UniProtKB/Swiss-Prot annotation:
Native organism taxonomy: Archaea, Methanobacteriati, Methanobacteriota, Stenosarchaea group, Methanomicrobia
Organism: Methanoculleus marisnigri (strain ATCC 35101 / DSM 1498 / JR1)
Pfam families xref list: vATP-synt_E
Keywords: ATP synthesis, Cell membrane, Hydrogen ion transport, Ion transport, Membrane, Transport
Origin superkingdom: Archaea
Protein family (similarity comment): Belongs to the V-ATPase E subunit family.
Name under which the protein is recorded: A-type ATP synthase subunit E
Single GO MF annotation: proton-transporting ATP synthase activity, rotational mechanism
One GO term describing the cellular component: proton-transporting two-sector ATPase complex, catalytic domain
């Protein structure tokens, strides 16, 4: 399954969850408004003039409070869903087939060698053997050595031998860049 399909599936799931949450919060708002109207009717019966002011005041307060509660719940739900989409996307990229991983790692190494000719390459434990094999097979990477595994979901981190330059080509870095640039678009798609 491609990343786009996974993202679309997650978006659709997110959209459905938001609709469910919105329906639940509408019920809460209606209950709060009904409660406010009942209280307002009691006040109006005992003192009409004071009750008119109290009714207006209470209804406005309760409606505002209910709207704030609803907005807070919706925003929290949206944030949770966006976090789930992000995590699922990161997991989906890490779970792509081995052939894809090998091609992606080779492309990232070719990109890195343009900036750092000699250095240490770090990958996660799963990808380290693949990276070592790529480094040993292609002469263009003869200036690279394999470093200790690092805690990244995939991709590589290349560090110059003197430690002054480090390039982070981890999948998380790429996803973060895409995520930041596409967050508004994703939010619009999921929640409108």
């Amino acid at each position: 399954m491609g990343l786009e399909a996974v993202v679309n599936e997650i978006r659709e799931k997110g959209r459905k969850e938001v609709e469910t949450i919105r329906a639940e919060t509408r019920t809460d708002v209606e209950e709060i408004l009904v409660d406010a109207q009942t209280r307002a009717a009691g006040i109006k019966a005992s003192a009409q003039e004071e009750a008119d002011r109290a009714v207006t005041h209470i209804i406005n307060q309760e409606a505002s409070a209910a709207n704030l509660v609803v907005k807070r719940q919706v925003l929290n739900a949206q944030k949770t869903l966006l976090d789930q989409v992000y995590s699922a996307s990161l997991a989906a990229v890490g779970d792509l087939p081995a052939e894809f991983q090998e091609k992606a790692l080779t492309a990232l190494l070719k990109r890195a060698v343009k900036e750092i000719k000699k250095g240490v390459v770090h990958a996660n434990e799963r990808d380290s053997p693949v990276v070592e094999e790529i480094l040993s097979q292609l002469k263009m990477f003869s200036g690279y050595t394999m470093g200790a595994p690092v805690d990244i979901p995939g991709g590589i981190i290349v560090e110059s031998n003197d430690g002054e330059l480090q390039i982070d080509y981890s999948y998380r870095t790429f996803l973060d860049e895409i995520w930041e640039s596409g967050l508004k678009d994703a939010s619009d798609i999921l929640f409108t």
